[in-house]
Amino acid sequence: WDVNDCIHFCLIGVVERSYTECHTMCT
């Protein structure tokens, strides 16, 4: 599971999150 993939799916998810939030959750 790639971090960038995780961030991508986080960003396009139902809940809008910032890149920073997604990066924090995915690392």
Curated annotation (Swiss-Prot):
Coiled coil: none annotated. It is found in: Secreted. GO terms for molecular function: toxin activity. Keywords: Disulfide bond, Secreted, Toxin. The cysteine framework is XIV (C-C-C-C). Expressed by the venom duct. It comes from Conus anabathrum floridanus. Belongs to the conotoxin R superfamily. This is Conotoxin flf14a. It comes from the Eukaryota. Disulfide bonds join C6-C26, C10-C22. One of its GO terms (cellular component) is extracellular region.
